[in-house]
Regions:
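Classic N-terminal secretory signal peptides
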Residues: 1-21
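Short, non-transmembrane alpha-helical segments in secretory-pathway proteins
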Residues: 28-52
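Surface-exposed patches in mature extracellular/periplasmic domains of secreted proteins
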Residues: 53-58, 91
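Short beta-strand segments that buttress and anchor functional surface loops
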Residues: 55, 66-69
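Conserved histidines in hydrophobic membrane contexts and catalytic metal-binding motifs
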Residues: 64-67, 79-80
């Protein structure tokens, strides 16, 4: 994922996050054997400027959920598609 795409996705996800959570965000229906390893997702987030990346956990909607600090120093909760690391929502 290119940084420009990530920035656009972060902006869109910020706007969509409350709606997504209210609607019961479903990130994937793919088998867990196809999911990225949490360590790979953590590395990807760090490469895109996030710091203080916390433990990566799966939620009921099959999203990876992680708390991290963004490039501006704000603490965020990120909802990621575990199959490819795409940002699905952010609070």
């Amino acid at each position: 994922m290119h940084i420009r795409r990530l920035i656009i996705l972060v902006g869109l996800a910020t706007l969509a996050a409350p709606l997504a959570r209210a609607a019961g965000l479903q990130c994937t229906t793919a088998d867990k054997s196809t999911w990225l390893a949490p360590a790979a997702v953590q590395k990807m987030l760090q490469e895109h400027g996030f710091s203080n990346v916390g433990a990566i956990k799966a939620d009921a909607g099959n999203c990876y959920v992680v708390q991290a600090t963004d490039q501006t120093g704000a603490k965020k909760t990120l909802y990621l598609d575990p199959t490819d690391g795409d940002l699905m929502g952010m609070e």
